[in-house]
Amino acid sequence: MSRVAKAPIEIPAGVEVTLNGQEVTIKGAQGSLSRVVNDAVELVKDESELRTNAREGVANSTAQAGTARALLQNMVVGVTKGFERKLQLIGVGYRAQAQGKKLNLTLGFSHPVEFEIPEGITIDTPTQTEVVVKGADKQLVGQVAANIRAYRKPEPYKGKGVRYADEQVRRKEAKKK
């Protein structure tokens, strides 16, 4: 039995939740997010909370209700506070510069890498070796950060590459003669 689904989602002041069948739209200070919830989940909205209930007689509906509750909670947090993911560029000559809707990356290739910033995401570069990805959609923020990291993953011998700020890179010892 999913314990996650039993906890209600608190709707803070300034957040508007709209239910249209199985589609949930949440609006807040950081923007608006929308998601279609699985048919195995029943949504109940009170004045200041949202509940996800498992439908009776549907296989794995409790698991689906727990998943839906976690996703909706992330949407509420996203439209109120937002999410961010920090990346570091480690290596000689590795640089990042945000220009409008593009992120220019110099990662040791023979050409600069231009990364197109998707809608709903803002990218800051506090220094030339730091990239901060911000947005309301947790999944999109993580995906954009993973796409940037994929251009040059940290290598295990010197640790050069693009890494998350909280990532520990396992180092290998060089081959001995």
From Swiss-Prot:
Keywords: Ribonucleoprotein, Ribosomal protein, RNA-binding, rRNA-binding
Cellular component terms (Gene Ontology): cytosolic large ribosomal subunit
SUPFAM superfamilies in the cross-refs: Ribosomal protein L6
InterPro entries per the UniProt record, alphabetical: Ribosomal_uL6-like, Ribosomal_uL6-like_a/b-dom_sf, Ribosomal_uL6_a/b-dom, Ribosomal_uL6_bac-type, Ribosomal_uL6_CS
GO molecular function, one term: rRNA binding
Family affiliation: Belongs to the universal ribosomal protein uL6 family.
NCBIfam families the record matches: L6_bact
Function per UniProt: This protein binds to the 23S rRNA, and is important in its secondary structure. It is located near the subunit interface in the base of the L7/L12 stalk, and near the tRNA binding site of the peptidyltransferase center.
UniProt name for this protein: Large ribosomal subunit protein uL6
Source organism (scientific name): Idiomarina loihiensis (strain ATCC BAA-735 / DSM 15497 / L2-TR)
High-level lineage: Bacteria, Pseudomonadati, Pseudomonadota, Gammaproteobacteria, Alteromonadales
